[in-house]
Amino acid sequence: MLNLISSLQKSAQLLTLYLDKFRKDYGVTQPEAHVLAVLHVRGETSIRNLHHTLGHKPSTLTSILDRLVARGFITRETSQTDRRSFNVELTLAGTVPAAVIRAALHSLENKIVRRSVSTDIRGITRVASTLEELIVSTRRAE
């Protein structure tokens, strides 16, 4: 059967295709684009917060951040309040791509919302939360 899983997989693939245009424009991958969009919305944030928001494995997130630092799109500094933590922030060079990516995602989300009913949106949110709970608890048990 796998109807729900197939739909989720297809949605993830379609988002990747949608964000692929930013690879051409700014040289960023889909996961890098999501990091830039989150930073544009939140401003300076901790790596822990990014990990919680995006769900990447710590090593994967570190690689994504390394590439964005190398391109000059973000900075990664030791937290002033907790020397064991690091904060990430957009640079001036990263602000434009982050704003463009965030605007594109916002526009896409608005189009989806306009074509959906509120129960659809709540259902998708519940499915995503349930998936996160199940995957995170399974990974912890391993």
Q: Can you describe what each PLM-predicted range is?
A:
Residues 1-26, 71, 119-122:
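N-terminal leader segment of winged-helix/HTH proteins
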Residues 29, 59-64, 91:
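Ser/Thr-centric signal marking residues that sit
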Residues 17-57:
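N-terminal helix-turn-helix DNA-binding core of bacterial DNA-binding proteins
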Residues 67-129, 136:
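Charged, amphipathic alpha-helical coiled-coil/dimerization segments
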